[in-house]
Curated annotation (Swiss-Prot):
Name listed for the protein in its UniProt record: Conotoxin Bu27
Function comment: Probable neurotoxin with ion channel inhibitor activity.
UniProt keyword annotations, A-Z: Amidation, Disulfide bond, Gamma-carboxyglutamic acid, Glycoprotein, Hydroxylation, Ion channel impairing toxin, Neurotoxin, Secreted, Toxin
Cellular compartments annotated: Secreted
Gene Ontology CC annotations of this record: extracellular region
Source organism of the structure: Conus bullatus
Length: 53
């Protein structure tokens, strides 16, 4: 059932799916998932699950 949830996200905004297609290192940020998210080396600008563009 969780797969359907990811599928909806992909259909809504496929351009946001850059690295991970289903989960981001064990969790689903519902947005883009850069590799730095896995190593926690992302700059403290945008929070996972939110788009502050």
């Amino acid at each position: 059932a969780s797969d359907g949830r990811n599928a909806v996200v992909h259909e809504r905004a496929p351009e946001l799916v850059v690295t991970a297609t289903t989960t981001c290192c064990g969790y689903d940020p519902m947005t883009i998932c850069p590799p730095c998210m896995c190593t926690h080396s992302c700059p403290p600008k945008r929070k996972p699950g939110r788009r502050n563009d």
